[in-house]
Amino acid sequence: MQSNLYKRQKEPLLIVISGPSGVGKDSVVKRMRELGLPFHFVVTATSRPQRPHETEGVDYIFVSKDEFGRMIEADELLEHADVYGQQKGIPKEQVREALNSSLDVVMRLDVQGARTIRDLSDDALLIFLVTQNEDELVRRLKERRTESPEALKLRLDMARQEMQGVEELFDYCVVNADSQLDAAVDTIVDIINAEHQRTKPRKVEL
């Protein structure tokens, strides 16, 4: 009798890249895209203004606050949150279509959003990014030059809070050190590959 292992189909993964502001979530996901990895990278909808280096439909889907409210009312978002006064959300149909096509889905979310996804699916794969130390995080946030001193303090206070309870919510913790972006990406890809070898695969249903 043939083993069921030979007949087993690959289950697509729902992968959340999360962590505090300044740990490099955007940089990690951008690098994964550049490498041409065979994943579907979710484009998040946001009501915040577009930054000079960002591309519509690639970095984010930029919408007005009124349009974002309409999307919430129409139940078009898998999760949504108010983050530092700016609304962000994951388009539901985009994720479902990719999973139904057997594609691994990668999304970047803040910790609040990651918690929402965990509530929706115990089998989602949650990866927490960190810097090597807090000094590195402070320097990165300051180098953005997009934060007032008050906003910077708020983000740092929030980061410290988000570091608490990581073990209960996340499956893995990956260090994204300065000048080591590719190493962080390699670690994440190794995690994904290992997850596909599990004898009891994750099965995401949304």
Regions from the language model: what does each represent?
Residues 25:
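Conserved lysine of the Walker
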Residues 28-29:
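Post-Walker A alpha-helix
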Residues 18-20:
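P-loop (Walker A) phosphate-binding loop of NTP-binding proteins
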Residues 33-42:
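Post-Walker A helix-loop "phosphate-sensing" segment adjacent to the P-loop in P-loop NTPases
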Residues 2-8, 139, 143-147, 164-206:
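NTP-dependent small-molecule kinase module
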Residues 46-105, 111-112:
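ATP-dependent small-molecule kinase phosphotransfer cores
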Residues 105-110, 119-143:
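Conserved phosphate-donor/acceptor-positioning beta-strand/loop module used by diverse small-molecule
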Residues 14-16:
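Short hydrophobic/aromatic beta-strand immediately N-terminal to the Walker A/P-loop
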